[in-house]
């Protein structure tokens, strides 16, 4: 017996949108652009060179 959806996700479906409800993939992309988060403004790119292999022993 497979678990029902409400057993797998007891807190609900969450912020996910069905592609049919969003008007297809184009509508989904427009929804994503409209709901841009402010997290990116506080994100600092302080990463060192991720592809620097000189320090590998």
UniProtKB/Swiss-Prot annotation:
Component of the CSN complex, probably composed of cops1, cops2, cops3, cops4, cops5, cops6, cops7, cops8 and cops9. It comes from the Eukaryota. It is found in: Nucleus; Cytoplasm; Nucleus, Nucleoplasm. The gene is cops9. One of its GO terms (cellular component) is chromatin. This is COP9 signalosome complex subunit 9. Component of the COP9 signalosome complex (CSN), a complex involved in various cellular and developmental processes. The CSN complex is an essential regulator of the ubiquitin (Ubl) conjugation pathway by mediating the deneddylation of the cullin subunits of SCF-type E3 ligase complexes, leading to decrease the Ubl ligase activity. May play a role in cell proliferation. It holds the Pfam family MYEOV2. Keywords: Cytoplasm, Nucleus, Signalosome. One of its GO terms (biological process) is positive regulation of cell population proliferation. It comes from Xenopus tropicalis. Belongs to the CSN9 family.
